[in-house]
């Protein structure tokens, strides 16, 4: 995120918060891996600023994505950080409910949260971070969740961390919240982190070259087959303008109907100028992030046009 954008959004949030004072508590929905041009720890800075506005006596609770880069600043300036439990993500609603119940419990005096994050230097590819099927990360998540509701454990989560960040203290591990029992929080968080470390080699993905992936896909009966170029994921901050997979499809599966997503404003503009049904020749890809490759020449027909807005 640009520094200017972050400052504007942050000031808007803090101004709204200041006008709302006095308040009983704060509940924030965050990601946890935000990076600003001049600031590595977006959420840590934001939580620190929120804490400065509301003071130490107002509870602050936030939800975090499983790929959050949980920093000491985040832990120190929040009373509770509640992690998502599923990947692929499908528990937004229930995670919000758990966070709201945590905040209400603090306000009602039902418990006094103590929170610890323990990390190990492991970066996990999204390919192996799933929680729906059997696998190393799913095992870690089940282990953490099995402790909730026992021995004063209010919440236990496992974080994959965003593997493409380049920041200090990056790592995966466990975050545990207990009812006033710091020793138990430390013990369980460190046990989750240790188990993560013990499974680190199980978390090494088996990846394929584009040509090999296409060959295996063509051997499958039925369809469709999804090829995922994870390093060019727009949701993870990449430009999403790589044409590596598209180029391989043209070379190895030219007769098979295929669909590729490429972010290329210049190419889109040319198609809009040419109009629906027109034949166009253009250079596609690697205009936003040219360090990873060169555009390829493509010729085709404009089948659809849209304004890019979705509902």
Set out the residue ranges of the language-model regions.
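N-terminal glycine-rich anion-binding loop in soluble enzyme alpha/beta folds
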Residues: 1-16, 171, 175-178, 182
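Active-site histidine-anchored catalytic micro-motif
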Residues: 2-10, 17-111, 224, 229-243, ...
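Core alpha/beta catalytic barrel or barrel-like domain that forms the active/cofactor pocket
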Residues: 28-31, 67, 114-117, 159-160, ...
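Short, compositionally biased low-complexity segments
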Residues: 76-79, 110-119, 164-168, 187
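Conserved anion/nucleotide-ligand pocket segment
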Residues: 96, 100, 104-145
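Hard-cation-handling environments
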Residues: 124-311
């Amino acid at each position: 995120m640009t520094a200017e954008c972050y400052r504007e959004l942050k000031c808007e949030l803090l101004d709204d918060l200041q006008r709302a004072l006095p308040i009983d508590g704060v509940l924030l929905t965050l990601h946890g891996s935000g990076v600003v041009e001049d600031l590595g720890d977006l959420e840590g800075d934001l939580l620190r600023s929120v804490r400065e506005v509301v003071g130490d006596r107002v509870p602050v609770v936030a939800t975090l994505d499983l790929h959050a880069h949980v920093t000491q600043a985040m832990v120190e300036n929040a009373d509770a950080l509640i992690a998502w439990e599923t990947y692929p993500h499908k528990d937004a609603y229930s995670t919000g409910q758990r966070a709201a119940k945590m905040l209400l419990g603090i306000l009602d005096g039902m418990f006094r949260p103590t929170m610890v994050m323990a990390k190990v230097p492991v970066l996990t590819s999204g390919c192996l971070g799933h929680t729906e099927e059997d696998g190393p990360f799913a095992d870690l998540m089940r282990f953490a969740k099995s402790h909730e509701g026992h021995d004063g454990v209010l919440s236990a989560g496992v974080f994959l961390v965003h593997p493409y960040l380049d920041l200090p203290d990056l790592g995966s591990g466990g975050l545990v919240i207990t009812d006033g029992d710091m020793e138990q929080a430390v013990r369980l968080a460190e046990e989750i982190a240790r188990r993560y470390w013990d499974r680190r080699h199980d978390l090494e993905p088996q990846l394929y070259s584009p040509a090999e992936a296409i060959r295996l896909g063509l051997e499958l009966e039925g369809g469709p087959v999804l090829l995922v170029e994870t390093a060019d994921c727009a949701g993870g901050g990449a430009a999403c303008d790589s044409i590596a997979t598209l180029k391989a499809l043209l070379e190895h599966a030219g007769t098979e109907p295929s669909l590729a997503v490429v972010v290329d404003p210049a190419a889109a503009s040319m198609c809009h100028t040419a109009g629906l049904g027109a034949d166009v020749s253009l250079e596609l890809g690697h205009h936003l992030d040219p360090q990873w490759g060169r555009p390829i020449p493509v010729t085709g027909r404009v089948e659809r046009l849209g304004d890019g807005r979705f509902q």
